Amino acid sequence: MNRDMSFFGRRVAFIGAHPDDIEIGAGALIAHIVPHTEVLCVTLSDNQKNPDLKNVVHEHYRSMEVLGVPRQQVVVGTFETRRFPHARQEILEYLIQLNREFMPEIVFTHTRADIHQDHATVTEEVLRAFRGTTVLGFDVLRSSYGFFPNFLVEVTEEDVQKKLQALAQYKTYETKYYFNPDITRSTLIRHGALAERPYAEGFDTLRIIGVFACSS
């Protein structure tokens, strides 16, 4: 008996605060779905206060290329890092315009369990801007507190490898524990175990919109 719930979106948006957030939270899923659906990846800040982070935007583009996302589908905004709470209205208007232009059927963004001020602001404004749209939350290990995935999506070994390769493009962060490939793989294995699958990407459900379809 098939116990999987199938879901699909013709247009799927991934929205993160900073370069690397989307890949950490959903890189394997992106690799899995990008051949089959239109994916848009939006990072709201290219403005990194730390001068040691001057290369992260270029690393982000290379990372997305590894995942198979076309360059024209990778958007990087200009909001100032660590100042998102002070730009809520501007972020909301930016996201509303994004919704009008792209009209995603599913949106992935930061989990509500994320305690980074920029990440939390993005989540709140995504929920306001994309009313009537399914929204799922991804985990960024370094800044989450109490995240537990209740929506698990099976991915393959190939997807896992692509996620690891994508994160390896961030030479800026190669010594950071949250970029350790063993931790990344272990997280995918753990989420897979929760789903009784070899690997899974894990999310929490911020909003689910659906129609129950009966098979004939």
Question: Across the structure, where does each feature detected by a protein language model lie?
Answer:
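Short Gly/Thr/Asp-enriched flexible loops that form oxyanion-binding sites at enzyme active sites
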Residues: Q117-A129
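Short beta-strand segments
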Residues: C41-T43, F108, G137
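Proline-aspartate-enriched helix->loop->beta-strand connector
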Residues: E93-D114, H119
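Active-site rim/loop-helix segments in enzyme catalytic domains that contact anionic ligands
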Residues: M1-M103, R128-G132, T187, T205-I208, ...
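Histidine-centered beta-alpha loop that forms part of the nucleotide-sugar donor binding/catalytic region
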Residues: T111-R112, D139-L141
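Residue-level signal for the nucleotide or nucleotide-sugar donor/cofactor binding architecture
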Residues: A17, Q117, E158
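The feature marks non-catalytic terminal segments
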Residues: M1-M5, R71, I106, T134, ...
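Active-site environment of divalent metal-dependent phosphoester hydrolases
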Residues: I22, Q48-N50, R82, D114-H119, ...
